[in-house]
């Protein structure tokens, strides 16, 4: 059997984490959740066939993709996907896949839409991640990307005031914690263009992500203000979070009938089957259990 490749960049795994509850449900993040929902509603197409949700976690955003016939929830953490399945159920509309963004287990050109929310900031090689995403998208597919903005107002003021060493205006990414990165907007735009994406719209999101404001001002007021300011992302991005709607350019090979998955090691096509599969190309076995497809490449012994 061919040994799995270990050449991909490091992965930030939320395996065993109670992130959904501790961060979103009890972590006073109602403001962030609400303004991200507004941004998604503004950027998503009204309808589609098959959406790939990259970094789906426990399925916080998944119900917001109601315009798509089917949604593939992809995350590296199997325990996060188990939480998502518990929340969303086992309806055929949702497909749960444990996999690495750098090694997506799908045939080329499969999806007509994709989202990557609060996920790129864990990528040491964002260009490689975007290249992987583009491969599995059909021509003219819509890609909604969110990234943590290095050039946010707080970082700018701290830098100008001498309280921060790193420069928010320089193009390189900054790792503010292990496997947590902020990116410069120009760098992200360049990487999207290099990987055959055309930006159609940009939104500046979470301008009011300030502890004092969230404690002292009504949630509805903050959400309304953020909603009113999101359009400014069209010409300037100084918010903590930036949302981009991009379109996949260039021809993509047609998907063969019956093809869905692809081996992440050798890229041999695999059927969409609710059972474990042995790759006909390299012999690797990919597990299916508890409603979750597991295509994570295991380190060589």
Predicted segment positions?
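Conserved class I S-adenosyl-L-methionine
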Residues: 1-47, 60-61, 80-83, 143-168, 297-301
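Short catalytic micro-motifs in class I SAM-dependent methyltransferases
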Residues: 118-122
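Acceptor-substrate binding/catalytic loop of class I
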Residues: 166-187
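A conserved beta-strand element that flanks and buttresses the S-adenosyl-L-methionine
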Residues: 115
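Class I SAM-dependent methyltransferase SAM/SAH-binding core
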Residues: 52, 56-103
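A C-terminal cap/extension of S-adenosyl-L-methionine-dependent methyltransferases
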Residues: 162-165, 190, 201-269, 273
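A short glycine-rich, Lys/Arg-flanked "PGG" loop and its adjoining helix->strand segment in the class I
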Residues: 127-142
């Amino acid at each position: 059997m061919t040994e799995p490749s270990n050449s991909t960049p490091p992965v930030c795994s939320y395996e065993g984490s109670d992130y959904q509850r501790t961060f979103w449900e009890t972590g006073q993040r109602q403001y962030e959740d609400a303004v991200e929902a507004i941004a998604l509603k503004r950027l998503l197409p009204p309808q589609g066939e098959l959406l790939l949700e990259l970094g789906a976690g426990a399925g916080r955003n998944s119900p917001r993709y109601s315009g798509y016939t089917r949604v593939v929830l992809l995350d590296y953490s199997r325990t996060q996907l188990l939480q998502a399945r518990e929340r969303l159920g086992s309806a055929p509309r949702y497909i749960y896949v444990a996999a690495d963004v750098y090694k997506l287990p799908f045939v080329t050109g499969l999806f007509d839409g994709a989202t990557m929310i609060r996920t790129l900031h864990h990528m040491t090689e964002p260009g490689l991640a975007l290249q992987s995403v583009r491969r599995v998208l059909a021509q003219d597919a819509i890609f909604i990307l969110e990234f943590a903005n290095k050039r946010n107002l707080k970082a700018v003021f701290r830098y100008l005031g001498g309280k921060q060493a790193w420069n928010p205006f320089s193009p390189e990414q900054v790792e503010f914690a292990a496997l947590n990165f902020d990116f410069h907007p120009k760098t992200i735009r360049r990487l999207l263009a290099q990987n055959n994406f055309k930006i159609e719209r940009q939104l500046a999101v979470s301008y009011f992500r300030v502890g004092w404001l969230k404690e002292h001002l009504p949630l509805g007021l903050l959400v309304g203000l953020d909603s009113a300011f999101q359009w400014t992302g069209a010409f300037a991005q100084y918010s903590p979070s930036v949302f981009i709607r991009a379109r996949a350019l260039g021809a993509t090979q047609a998907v063969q009938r019956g093809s869905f998955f692809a081996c992440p090691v050798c890229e041999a096509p695999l059927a969409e089957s609710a059972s474990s599969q042995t790759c006909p190309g390299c012999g690797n076995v990919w597990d299916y259990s508890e409603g979750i497809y597991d295509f994570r490449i295991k380190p060589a012994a």
